């Protein structure tokens, strides 16, 4: 038996950062190397995401349990993978996808497949004595991502009256990731004081950002501009802004409801264009509903030459959806969430498709996270140039930032911060 053969697979139900169950898998190889992976879960999910298998038993966790997914790993996936070479990642992922047999991993569950997929990769890296970013990315894995830091939460991520889901700061002007992280932390601290002085709540949402009640989306942007200046930075030059509109969340019957009124798609496009002129906004995610291809084209035509337009619900890390977007010129960037597609192999293929077509990739967390730091390594491995992993508090968010600090230290003089070369390829 060769040393990198899979000798054991175990799985268990654990809790994510919202106190909801999720799947953890452990893969052990013949050489003794072990890979451990935990799967995140989203709050605002795209309709076209791979299927997250939940138990539906109202007597446990309100039906959110994942014992079925755990059982599928133990009883179906494990027998098919024992003895397989962990270094043959694509073969292992294809085995699980074939075993599932459905179009969206509804049989075994994307959460079951992804947990084993990631644990296998980590075990393979451990067996070779390599950090995960080097194992996945090879010798060119040296680009540290610009963080898009979600410091004001709204929409489905917070219990407040703010329509847009995320208001982010982007410290692209820093000279290193370590400096970018410090800048973000200092703005976050300044924002806390600004909110406090205005008598606004400083409680945080799912992703660690503040979640105050505000009269408009524009009011949130004004707060960020004030905080950036208060922290001693130049808005637009050193630190810019980014939005996750999550427009599907407030779309109904062809209308978008925000700022207290219903608006047409054309009105929303004009609104986003105006905001991007009035504020130093470098990125807008999910500016329109996930299946409104026609208006996505219009938005891209109108401001895509100067603003990064990111498809999250639009593309759901799916190469088929991304290919359609490329052909129809909808958006110019894709958000990458491992659990939207459900395997490491398919995630890497989607990133490759984006890169070949000059679409930027932003590696992303989910609102329900764990202490797993895979996405930090993935961002460096793929040279994506950007990462979304929340605010500057809550340890499930900070864990990813701290992992990137360690990677930057490991790389030493080889490390390049993506902000110095324009936030990655595209």
Swiss-Prot record:
One GO location term (cellular component): extracellular region
Keyword Metal-binding belongs to the record: yes
Gene Ontology biological process terms from the UniProt entry: glycolytic process
Pfam families: Enolase_C, Enolase_N
Residues binding Mg(2+): 244, 285, 312
Entry keyword set: Cytoplasm, Glycolysis, Lyase, Magnesium, Metal-binding, Secreted
Cofactor: record remark: Binds a second Mg(2+) ion via substrate during catalysis.
Catalyzed reactions per annotation: (2R)-2-phosphoglycerate = phosphoenolpyruvate + H2O
Broadest EC class assigned to this enzyme: lyase
NCBIfam families according to UniProt: eno (TIGR01060)
Function: Catalyzes the reversible conversion of 2-phosphoglycerate (2-PG) into phosphoenolpyruvate (PEP). It is essential for the degradation of carbohydrates via glycolysis.
Name assigned to this protein: Enolase
Taxon lineage: Bacteria, Bacillati, Cyanobacteriota, Cyanophyceae, Gomontiellales
């Amino acid at each position: 038996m060769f040393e990198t053969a899979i000798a054991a697979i175990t799985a268990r139900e654990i809790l994510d950062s919202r106190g909801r169950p999720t799947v953890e898998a452990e893969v052990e190889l013949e050489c003794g190397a072990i890979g451990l992976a935990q799967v995140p879960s989203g709050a605002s999910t795209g309709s076209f995401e791979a299927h997250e298998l939940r138990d539906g038993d109202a007597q446990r966790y309100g039906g959110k349990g994942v014992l079925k997914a755990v059982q599928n790993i133990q009883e179906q996936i494990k027998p098919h993978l024992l003895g397989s070479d962990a270094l043959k990642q694509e073969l292992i992922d294809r085995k699980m996808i074939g075993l599932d047999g459905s179009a969206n991993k509804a049989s075994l569950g994307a959460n079951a497949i992804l947990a084993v997929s990631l644990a296998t990769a980590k075990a393979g890296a451990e067996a070779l004595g390599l950090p995960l970013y080097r194992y996945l990315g090879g010798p060119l894995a040296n680009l540290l991502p610009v963080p898009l830091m979600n410091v004001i939460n709204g929409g489905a991520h917070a219990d407040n009256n703010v329509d847009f889901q995320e208001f982010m700061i982007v410290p692209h002007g820093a000279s290193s990731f370590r400096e970018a992280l410090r800048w973000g932390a200092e703005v976050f601290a300044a924002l806390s004081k600004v909110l406090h002085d205005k008598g606004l709540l400083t409680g945080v949402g799912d992703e660690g950002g503040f979640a105050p009640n505000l009269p408009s989306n524009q009011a949130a942007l004004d707060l960020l501009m004030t905080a950036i200046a208060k922290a001693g930075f130049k808005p637009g030059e050193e630190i810019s802004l980014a939005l996750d509109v999550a427009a599907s969340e407030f779309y109904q019957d062809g209308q978008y409801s925000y700022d207290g009124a219903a608006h047409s798609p054309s009105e929303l496009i004009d609104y986003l264009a105006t905001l991007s002129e009035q504020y130093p906004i470098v990125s807008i995610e999910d500016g329109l509903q996930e299946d409104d291809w026609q208006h996505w084209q219009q938005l891209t035509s109108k401001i895509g030459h100067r603003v990064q337009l990111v498809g999250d619900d639009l593309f759901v890390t799916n190469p088929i959806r991304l290919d359609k977007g490329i052909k129809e010129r909808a958006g110019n960037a894709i958000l990458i969430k491992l659990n939207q597609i459900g395997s490491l192999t398919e995630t890497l293929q989607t990133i490759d498709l984006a890169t070949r077509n000059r679409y930027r990739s932003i590696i992303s967390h989910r609102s329900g996270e764990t202490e797993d730091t895979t996405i930090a390594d993935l961002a460096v491995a793929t040279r994506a140039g950007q990462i979304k992993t929340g605010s500057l508090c809550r340890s499930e968010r900070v864990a990813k930032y701290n992992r990137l600090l360690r990677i930057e230290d490991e790389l030493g003089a080889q490390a390049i911060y993506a902000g110095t070369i324009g936030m990655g390829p595209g």
